[in-house]
Structure formats: C-alpha cells, structure tokens
Amino acid sequence: MKVTVIGAGNVGATVAECVARQDVAKEVVMVDIKDGMPQGKALDMRESSPIHGFDTRVTGTNDYGPTEDSDVCIITAGLPRSPGMSRDDLLAKNTEIVGGVTEQFVEGSPDSTIIVVANPLDVMTYVAYEASGFPTNRVMGMAGVLDTGRFRSFIAEELDVSVRDVQALLMGGHGDTMVPLPRYTTVGGIPVPQLIDDARIEEIVERTKGAGGEIVDLMGTSAWYAPGAAAAEMTEAILKDNKRILPCAAYCDGEYGLDDLFIGVPVKLGAGGVEEVIEVDLDADEKAQLKTSAGHVHSNLDDLQRLRDEGKIG
C-alpha cells in the first residue's frame, strides 16, 4: 500500500513519520514544491527506521509521478494567515493551492481516498472534493480526531487518569463553533458529568475550542504533533479497514438535517473511506449548537463562491 503526503512542512512531515511508524503502508511519498525539503526529511526518516523498527520506505519528491497508484493522500499544503493578509486573501490562496494539488494528484491515483488537513478545514475539504471528482465517501477532513484528542487530553489531566480510558465525541466545524458533547464522553465507561461538575466541564469545553490558538500564542506557529497523529490514525483505519468510529469532516446529505457541506460528524471509517455517517441523538441545545456551526461553514462556502464570482479564484 502507498500513502502520499502533500506538503512536507511540520504537519506533513509528522504525518509521514507517524504513518511510517505504523508500518501499515509499503511506501510513504512526501511531495513539496521546495527542492530538497521532502527528499531530506524522507532520508532522515529512513535512517531512523532501524531504530524505530519499521520497514515502510519513505521518499520525497517535487513532482507527482512517484505518487501514482496511492491508496491514501493526506493534503497538508496551504498557507497560514500572515500579518496584513485578509481572510479573503487566505481563502483564495489556499483554495488555489488545495484545488491545484488535488487535481495533480488524482491524475495518477483515481481510486484513492483523500484526507484534507489544510485550513479553513471544512471549506478546503469541499474544494478537494470538487477538484477530485471523487464520490463523497472518498474525501474527508481531519478535524474531529484532533479536537476530540485535545478534549480527551484535558479531561485526563483534570481527573489524573490515563488518556486511554477517556472516550469522547465532538461535532461541528473545525474552529470556535465546534460542539463538544460531554454527555457522550466517558472515562472507563463512566459518563464524565458524573465525575466533573458542569462548571468545570464548560471550562474544559472552552479550552478545547481555543486549543489551537493556545499553541499559536505559546510558539508563534500552529501545532503539528497532534494534527499529524490524528491524520495518521485516520489513515491507519482506512488501510487496515478497521471500521473505526471516529469524528471526521464528512459530507452530509440530510444527516442531522444538514445538506451539501463537509462538517464534523461521527463516521465509520474503513477501506471504503467514510462508510457510514452515524447519527446520534442530540438534545435541543446540542442541535442548536450544531446548526450554528453548520451556518458558519455555509457562510465560508458562500464567501468561496463570492470570490469565484468576483474572479479572485480561477
């Protein structure tokens, strides 16, 4: 099996290393426009393979020929918002990047599954879906696994328990409007509201929503370890056909009353990509929060269409 990672920056390289160390794929190919960057990082990873004990071959390239016949592609390419850059400028630029790399990749791998990591996540997943021409089950975004991981980490810290015993569910868009669901969160099978009072749970929820920004404030750049690990977990579920139940940005066509958008929902993830969108019962407040989150995603999609109509995106 072959996995392609587009973008050899911090997130892309971390994804590549995590997938290689899983030893599930025969080959991991990193693609980047910067000459020497993917080749050097790939060589470094190969030299670590005897120490970590994996046989996956990691290679780097500046063109898409070596990516042919990939089973999974993780798109990490994209720009962060820089000082002076408007939100429209960022959306336009990343749409061009994600759309362009998707078109180049799918020429040689028409039967692959695509995982999008680039931001704004929910919109970029839609862009990749359009550019690929793939069915909706073979395009998804990585957000829920990351955000849920952060939520689980904070709960484990609060209770001083192993993260392995914390299971959680989080839905909605990737950002401030995400919807953590404490009543679907358990520690060793015990519902977390029985272990943590409501006020403290709400504080943990708010920290989860701002977790990405917390890291940016500390380092001056965005996270890469947790996003890389999250994308690798999704990749493993697909390659192994594990039928994992994970929250992903998946296409909704009536599920949860949502239509024509990619948004975080629990899915069954296996060899067929998103094999099922799982609908759980939501109370009135949770439904309202999810509707608000979906409205934010639709607003971003409207902005995307406006920029296209204005000729700012090719």
From Swiss-Prot:
Domain of life: Bacteria
CDD domains xref list: LDH-like_MDH
Reactions accelerated catalytically: (S)-malate + NAD(+) = oxaloacetate + NADH + H(+)
Pfam family, one: Ldh_1_C
Binding-site residues for NAD(+), renumbered to this chain: G7, A8, G9, N10, V11, G12, D32, N94, V117, A118, N119
Active site: H174 (proton acceptor)
Entry GO MF terms: L-lactate dehydrogenase activity; L-malate dehydrogenase (NAD+) activity
GO biological processes: lactate metabolic process; tricarboxylic acid cycle
Binding site for substrate: R81, R87, N119, R150
Documented EC number(s): 1.1.1.37
Broad EC category: oxidoreductase
Role according to the record: Catalyzes the reversible oxidation of malate to oxaloacetate.
HAMAP family per record: Malate_dehydrog_3
Name of the featured protein: Malate dehydrogenase
